[in-house]
Amino acid sequence: MGKVPSSFRSMPANLLVRKTTPSPPAPPRDFRNRTAVGGDSAKLPQNTQAPREPSLRNPFKSPNLSDAKSLFNSIAATSRIPLDLKFHNSVLQSYGSIAVVNDTVKLFQHILKSQPNFRPGRSTFLILLSHACRAPDSSISNVHRVLNLMVNNGLEPDQVTTDIAVRSLCETGRVDEAKDLMKELTEKHSPPDTYTYNFLLKHLCKCKDLHVVYEFVDEMRDDFDVKPDLVSFTILIDNVCNSKNLREAMYLVSKLGNAGFKPDCFLYNTIMKGFCTLSKGSEAVGVYKKMKEEGVEPDQITYNTLIFGLSKAGRVEEARMYLKTMVDAGYEPDTATYTSLMNGMCRKGESLGALSLLEEMEARGCAPNDCTYNTLLHGLCKARLMDKGMELYEMMKSSGVKLESNGYATLVRSLVKSGKVAEAYEVFDYAVDSKSLSDASAYSTLETTLKWLKKAKEQGLVP
């Protein structure tokens, strides 16, 4: 033997090392007494990733502990090079990827006993900790067991330890255990950094009621002086906006000043998007005006969101006014801007106006996409402008533009109702050949429409 297996030699020694981050400033007011009207996300900076299984072939053929000890003893006895920390970490990670937590810990203890020169490092215990948190057979007692081993070997759990444990538990759906462990580690050892705190907060928002999230925020602040930052507030506001609880969102915004923070453009855009989704154009405009009053400069996303919301609410003239404001502010309208406006115009029956907007869009060098064409196709067919609709369809077909379900269904129904069944079959063929829709979906729409036509003829509703 004599050679260390390549899969052991390939594992990096500093797999889990990362820089710590200072805690956030400024406390918010008490959340505890707030109750949510709705039920239960802001992007977070990427943080430490817990260790993954080795990419090369695992030298351990079986999870059997005796076999693992024998393999390790054989390598240790015949190796011509010193076995360093990297090697021992690789052994534990490779074996841990196929074994239960209890056996992995026992192999670690065997290595300690049989190798007097082995001094486990922090990365060693983080490998064991990650395995204890991720293993499907593991309980929280195994996590505590690894943490106790760490302390007994002279290494206090730090922010990296908390980060690895919390992320690993959350990624396996054990959010309650992650929450309890964070509080325990904060009390006994070290508070989490902002990234870990916000990571857990985001997961709590995804799977817990809002009052549970507020209780966690209050406990961490009151008991451990760990306070939410602007990212934390953005996570909370994004969560309540997604649950359509916009009153709570505005409440949280009103408390940002008390917490020493100033809302940024991203946060205002999040709230505006919530109002626009509910077709509350006036409230969306109110958010825009508040931004301006607070000295927060709107960006392209702000204008696109506002134009989308106003168009959806049928307030097309206002949407066009903000299109001009957007250009005056130095932002070039993009495909999303024009498509939103076209959709609003088609909803109001202004399909020809939407079609002229397509020409304006292309004249400005902005390329329409599949959604743009399908929006116009749907609008023209709904307005019974079949000549224009077929002209647009032929242009789409020659350019290889795919049909979307709404545009396809409206076109097929309009053709059948106009007595142009052969043309409807041709549209069906294109939808299938271009893989715009599945065969079943495309045929279902055509079949339903033809059944309607047959019934209408029987009742004398159509010639």
Swiss-Prot record:
Which ranges does the UniProt record give for the PPR repeats?
A: 121-157, 158-192, 193-223, 229-263, 264-298, 299-333, 334-368, 369-403, 404-438
Any idea which UniProt keywords this protein has? Repeat
Q: Which InterPro entries match?
A: Pentatricopeptide_rpt, PROP1-like_PPR_dom, TPR-like_helical_dom_sf
Q: Which Gene3D superfamilies match?
A: Tetratricopeptide repeat domain
Q: Is ATP-binding found in the keyword set?
A: no
Q: Which PROSITE patterns match?
A: PPR
Instruction: State the signal peptide span.
Output: none
Q: Protein name, please?
A: Pentatricopeptide repeat-containing protein At2g17670
Organism field = Arabidopsis thaliana (Mouse-ear cress)
